Amino acid sequence: MIFADPPYFLSNDGFSCQNGQMVSVNKGNWDKSKGMAADLEFYEEWLRLCYALLKPNGTIWVCGTFHNIYLIGYLMQTVGYHILNNITWEKPNPPPNLSCRFFTHSTETILWAKKNKKAKHTFHYEMMKAQNNGKQMKCVWTFPPPNKTEKTFGKHPTQKPLSLLERCILSASNIGDLIFDPFMGSGTTGVAALKHGRRFCGCELEEDFFELAKKRLEK
């Protein structure tokens, strides 16, 4: 199984509100767009590499927002993936909309796909149903942002909550399976994988984030 949370390329010198204070949305050079053509080339390249790595019965989860998810979804289907679900992660307490000119952004999207339409993928339907009070698990998930414990060794500007990763991993993999994260960040995917008896492999170019992930995984 692959879980990918790629750069959204949203570091555009704008501002947001965090804990009642104005903060820059810039996260680093790794999140700055080099133009639509370059972004498209970047997304397609790693999606093709992941496609080659993915086992015939494996699945991939890819995160995004409306800024990039439509492009990613198009490219995934061009590469050959078959999309299974469009998961909506709802944030219960999102940053306020400072412009007051459109609805408050309160969700992110996760595309879940298998290698091709005929592939027999893993999905623990009964487990997910049991976790949802005996009802079918829907594709809208509500999770709060990472808590303080998850940031003990430091934080990542786009860190996903551990509970979100746990649901993805538990629903679509088995004990002993290898989970790969091509954009490891703070290592949350690895923490969730190891916690539930899976193996883990991750990549991270930013040295500070690599060291953060290493500390979390060694714990």
Where are these regions (language model features)?
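Core catalytic lobe of class I
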Residues: 1-211
